[in-house]
Amino acid sequence: MLDIRLFRNEPVTVKSKIELRGDDPKVVDEILELDEQRRKLISATEEMKARRNKVSEEIALKKRNKENADDVIAEMRTLGDDIKEKDSQLNEIDNKMTGILCRIPNLISDDVPQGESDEDNVEVKKWGTPREFSFEPKAHWDIVEELKMADFDRAAKVSGARFVYLTNEGAQLERALMNYMITKHTTQHGYTEMMVPQLVNADTMYGTGQLPKFEEDLFKVEKEGLYTIPTAEVPLTNFYRNEIIQPGVLPEKFTGQSACFRSEAGSAGRDTRGLIRLHQFDKVEMVRFEQPEDSWNALEEMTTNAEAILEELGLPYRRVILCTGDIGFSASKTYDLEVWLPSYNDYKEISSCSNCTDFQARRANIRFKRDKAAKPELAHTLNGSGLAVGRTFAAIVENYQNEDGTVTIPEALVPFMGGKTQISKPVK
């Protein structure tokens, strides 16, 4: 959520930033109009309350002097009714303002490129060279079924489209990837490992920006009023919701693996085969809490943490800056990492790393103190995929496939695969 003072002091800037996202800047005028009404109501209410205090003294004085106080008692009642009415009006305006403010996205950083869609994202780095095959490479969805690493048909029978059973060495590879990623982040990148709740309440979803605007993308357990998480970013970021982080704690760096659940509303017909776009998938997440002046350097560091995984696995990738028309709701700046997939003959997103500045912290009321005597300030929050496990799985299977139908295990993963160096079709 944005600071109301930005609307008061820099309305032109806020309008231009909103317009860059393709949204209607008139919302700024709506907020300013409601803010003016609110301030007038507060002023009028304060005057009434001051008069009520004075009338209360007059009533007491008249009673002490045994004088008739009927007129001031009547005024007191009228004032009470008027104050109640003003408070009701103020509450209504507050609700309207909050309802609008919570749907306005974060302000985009000045160095984010302008554009309308992912076609306008800007490549800033490329690592590795896509492999040239001496044979016709297969898509990962064909490879995993031939090697009995996955079963899409039985998953569809049990749960519907966009689900998968990972079986045999497929399940082992998924687990190995999660263990490898978590181990690297905790032992080399300085993150604290967390196991997170995978059902959260509405306040938690509000804190990170999924609610109220993106409810259609979520799965909800109606009876309990809980939501399945679309990413571990949600519970990790809300760890400090409604808290003041004490001096000396920041920077705080969390990492956690979780299942992620997404309805994929609006993605009909896209990536319908394989592991790229499922309703349920595993992901290793990184979340950071930073002092405001440190958050931009933290974004660069977190992005290199994700890149280190891809490089150690030997997977060609590129880094792009998301343009103004493609960046997420809560982010001020986002880097996407895209891994090379031979089946697409293209790069596909495997990680997003974002600086959300104080946007989520204001929604979730996450503050910190620089020292014990200092006034609490809003922290900056960052999040990044480190990495999407299913997409990493797909990238390994495709990039490390062999002509004889086997898949070579990347060297970095061998210890996490029990020493296994290759996946072959099971005998049975």
Swiss-Prot record:
Its EC number is 6.1.1.11. Pathway: Aminoacyl-tRNA biosynthesis; selenocysteinyl-tRNA(Sec) biosynthesis; L-seryl-tRNA(Sec) from L-serine and tRNA(Sec): step 1/1. ATP binds at residues 262-264, 349-352. It catalyses: tRNA(Ser) + L-serine + ATP = L-seryl-tRNA(Ser) + AMP + diphosphate + H(+); tRNA(Sec) + L-serine + ATP = L-seryl-tRNA(Sec) + AMP + diphosphate + H(+). L-serine binds at residues 231-233, 285, 385. Consists of two distinct domains, a catalytic core and a N-terminal extension that is involved in tRNA binding. This is Serine--tRNA ligase. It comes from Staphylococcus aureus (strain MW2).
